Amino acid sequence: MLSETKVIEIYTDGACSGNPGLGGWGAILRWNSHERELYGGKEYTTNNQMELMAAICALNALKESCSIDLYTDSVYVRNGISLWLENWKKNNWRTASKSPVKNMELWQALDGACARHNVRWHWVKGHAGHPDNERADALARKAITEYRQNGYFKG
């Protein structure tokens, strides 16, 4: 059952050292005075894939269905989820030009993660001083740094 009274704020970001290259994602989940930071990464990936992973992992971390305000600085994620996704599904995961949707598995995972929740998507300008977006970016970069130092992702 969807908890309409519990509204979660989520801030997500992805980063890549080389594109493609070593990548990280970060997310901040906030409910009232409670806050949780998540981060992780992948050895060989793209920035867009990490942006998607940040949202997927944040949504999947929630144990119950909630109302969510999700903030991303990715125009790709915002447009994909808000403008393109329904048509991709109707067109058997093909774009309007009939080519296969890039990152289809991640889009499908995001669609599935969203299905449990009432998600309102918000775009924020990246690297423009928004404190929570900057923190999500720092978490994504932390994942990359930790991998370089340890040889694995700790997050």
Swiss-Prot record:
Name the enzyme's class: hydrolase
Instruction: Output the SUPFAM superfamilies linked to this UniProt entry.
Output: Ribonuclease H-like
Q: Does the keyword NAD apply?
A: no
UniProt-annotated binding residues for Mg(2+) 2:
D13, D137
Q: What is its EC number?
A: 3.1.26.4
Listed A to Z, the keywords are: Cytoplasm, Endonuclease, Hydrolase, Magnesium, Metal-binding, Nuclease
| Domain RNase H type-1, chain residue ranges per copy | 4-145
Record localization: Cytoplasm
One GO CC annotation: cytoplasm
The GO terms this record gives for MF are: magnesium ion binding; nucleic acid binding; RNA-DNA hybrid ribonuclease activity
Identify its protein family: Belongs to the RNase H family.
Protein name per UniProt: Ribonuclease H
Q: Which organism is it from?
A: Bartonella bacilliformis (strain ATCC 35685 / KC583 / Herrer 020/F12,63)
> What gene is this protein translated from?
rnhA
